[in-house]
Amino acid sequence: MLQSNPVIHPNTSNRHFKFEPFLRQEYNFGLDPDRPVCQFYNPLNPDNSCPQGNNCPNKHVSAMYSNKIVCKHWLRGLCKKGDHCEFLHEYNLRKMPECLFYSKNGYCTQTSECLYLHVDPQSKIPECLNYNQGFCSEGPNCKNRHVRRVLCPLYLYGFCPKGPECEFTHPKFDFHNLNLRIRPDNLIQMTSKHVDNSKEESDKKEDSEPKEESI
C-alpha cells in the first residue's frame, strides 16, 4: 500500500493562523453552514442567552430572520452566503418559498414530492371589505373575494373570550364621525323658552280672531 508523501500532501489539521479566531468570531469563518441551531440562544436577548457567546460552535439565528422564508438556493445546496443569507437555512414547511411552476400553470409535476409551497390562486385575491361588513353592491361581479363565514354569536352579544383565535368571524363596523356637539344647558333652556313663547303667541292670535257665526 502506497503511503502519501508528507511533502506533497502535508497534514495541516494541527496548524492554525493567529487570525482564525477573529474570522470565526466576527464572520463565522470555517464553521459548518449545516451545523445545528443553538438551543440556549435567545434572539430577543442575544447578549445574555448563550454562555459561549460568539464562540459557540452552533448556529445563532437572529430575530430578523424569524419571519423569513426558506432559501431556495440552500434547498439545492447552492447558497454561497452562509449565515449572512437573508433567508432561512433550515427545513420549515410553514416558511417554504412558493412554487413558481404551480403559480403559473395551476399544477406541479412534482406533486407531493415538491418541497415548495403550493398557494391557491384564489387566496391571493384580496377580501371584499364591504362584503365582510354585511353587504356588497357589486354582488358576484365584484373583483374582490367574497368569503362566507359564520358570525360569532358571543361577539354579537358584546364579548367573545376567544378573541382573534375564535373559529367564527368577528365583523368590524366602521362608524363615520358626524362631528356632533352637545349644546350647553343655557342654550337648551333658551330654545325651550322660545318654543313656549311662540306657542303662547299663536294661541292668543287664534283667540283674538273673530269667529264666523253659523246661520
Swiss-Prot record:
Family: Belongs to the CPSF4/YTH1 family.
Pfam families hit by this protein: zf-CCCH, zf-CCCH_2
BP GO annotations: mRNA processing; response to xenobiotic stimulus
Top-level taxon: Eukaryota
Lineage: Eukaryota, Fungi, Dikarya, Ascomycota, Saccharomycotina
Basic and acidic residues compositional bias, start-end: 193-215
Cystine pairings recorded for this chain: none
GO cellular component annotations of the record: cytosol; mRNA cleavage and polyadenylation specificity factor complex
GO molecular function (one): RNA binding
Zinc finger map (C3H1-type): 32-63, 65-92, 93-121, 122-149, 151-173
PROSITE patterns in the cross-refs: ZF_C3H1
Protein name: mRNA 3'-end-processing protein YTH1
Organism: Candida albicans (strain SC5314 / ATCC MYA-2876) (Yeast)
Coiled-coil ranges from the UniProt annotation: none
